[in-house]
Amino acid sequence: MPKTQSAAGYKAGVKDYKLTYYTPDYTPKDTDLLAAFRFSPQPGVPADEAGAAIAAESSTGTWTTVWTDLLTDMDRYKGKCYHIEPVQGEENSYFAFIAYPLDLFEEGSVTNILTSIVGNVFGFKAIRSLRLEDIRFPVALVKTFQGPPHGIQVERDLLNKYGRPMLGCTIKPKLGLSAKNYGRAVYECLRGGLDFTKDDENINSQPFQRWRDRFLFVADAIHKSQAETGEIKGHYLNVTAPTCEEMMKRAEFAKELGMPIIMHDFLTAGFTANTTLAKWCRDNGVLLHIHRAMHAVIDRQRNHGIHFRVLAKCLRLSGGDHLHSGTVVGKLEGDKASTLGFVDLMREDHIEADRSRGVFFTQDWASMPGVLPVASGGIHVWHMPALVEIFGDDSVLQFGGGTLGHPWGNAPGATANRVALEACVQARNEGRDLYREGGDILREAGKWSPELAAALDLWKEIKFEFETMDKL
């Protein structure tokens, strides 16, 4: 048997973390939760000591030896820093790979996992900067979670929509409309050809538009547009609320109105609330759209925080059928390789490690349903060929200003997007190259769609060309 700390005896005092938590000879187990951290130690702190400190402070350690260590098997429960490597091209920057025993975590609780791994260690003085780049959830832990309420295939079956990405639109202005005018905007977009419309992240229940009024007028818009088009329509009714009890009351009312999908701001509301809502959605046959409001506060800086791929994986465990993922081509931050890496982590069942896409660990989801990525933020019809090529069919392409900003109004804006999408999907299915021929494909479609022609003319010069801050 390996010699444990208990067998070695107790000696009071402070000792280097690496004596206990740096274990370069350790081989991770299939049941271990693995984490990859990017870190920069303070001057004078060796990389192995800093890596060990991260393992200690995110698992069983504290700053001094304590006699109660003798009451348990520390070697069994401690986090183990099993590998450290320098970050290529960066001075005093390293990756630390840490293995955590499965027993450290409560089953089915993203809240507990994050509280353990990132809850305290990010304020540790010995570390100048720290970022959680990736997590490998072991299958044994994955199986304790419900995950998405329904998943991609069930959603397509419920909505009877196949063979193409789905189209959405965020209603603008995001704040200030009365409930009736809001419902009117929803109706115009849906009758024009969109599959979904959406509450913005900060629409909850404000004085100018109380939630119950909004739900009622939106329900009228959905039922009317469905009757006119013969297609199933949806609107992401934001049920995010000050309390979980109020959140569930709003969700129940949406269900009573026959709404197929609701929405939640999972970061600002918290993982406990989100998991509660996801389980309710599974039990009640309601789809769940997830907005990532506040994510850039956590994930945008490349040297400190949590990468969005970790947040996306945590959301898949907690539960959501849609998740905003960036666009690559729009107004919001998003490197292409990295974005496609975490999009696969959202949708696929098994993803191999691929550092070129930021995927540090092979992840097996054990048949857990996938999450539809939602491309949203500064996109318009000229982006359609690239979006179809990048995201494929299993996605939601969401045009807010790119629908409502059409010179002829909401319904023509929706029609322009639908025509552009159908043209790109047909061209792709015929074997045409969307990257090389995308402009020609759109112009050809615009010849028989005046709505698309007007949109192409309006936004032909609009681009968002800024350097991505978070590069691999």
Swiss-Prot record:
Keyword Lipid metabolism carried by entry: no
Binding site for substrate: N120, T170, K174, R292, H324, S376
Molecular function via GO: magnesium ion binding; monooxygenase activity; ribulose-bisphosphate carboxylase activity
Short sequence motif Interacts with RbcX2: positions: 461-467
Post-translational changes noted in the entry: The disulfide bond which can form in the large chain dimeric partners within the hexadecamer appears to be associated with oxidative stress and protein turnover.
Catalytic residues as annotated in Swiss-Prot or TrEMBL: K172, H291
Keywords: Bacterial microcompartment, Calvin cycle, Carbon dioxide fixation, Carboxysome, Disulfide bond, Lyase, Magnesium, Metal-binding, Monooxygenase, Oxidoreductase, Photorespiration, Photosynthesis
Site (Transition state stabilizer): residue numbering on this chain: K331
Compartment list: Carboxysome
PANTHER family linked to this entry: RIBULOSE BISPHOSPHATE CARBOXYLASE, RIBULOSE BISPHOSPHATE CARBOXYLASE LARGE CHAIN
Subunit structure: Heterohexadecamer of 8 large chains and 8 small chains; disulfide-linked. The disulfide link is formed within the large subunit homodimers. The exposed C-terminus binds in a cleft in the RbcX2 (shown with endogenous and Anabaena strain CA protein). RbcX2 is displaced by RbcS; as RbcX2 is removed RbcS mediates the ordering of an internal RbcL loop (Thr-64-Leu-70) in a catalytically active conformation.
HAMAP family attached to this UniProt entry: RuBisCO_L_type1 (MF_01338)
Domain notes: Binding of RbcS probably induces a conformation change that displaces RbcX2 and triggers the final mature conformation.
Protein's name in the database: Ribulose bisphosphate carboxylase large chain
Organism of origin: Synechococcus sp. (strain ATCC 27144 / PCC 6301 / SAUG 1402/1)
Taxonomic lineage: Bacteria, Bacillati, Cyanobacteriota, Cyanophyceae, Synechococcales
Gene, per the UniProt record: cbbL
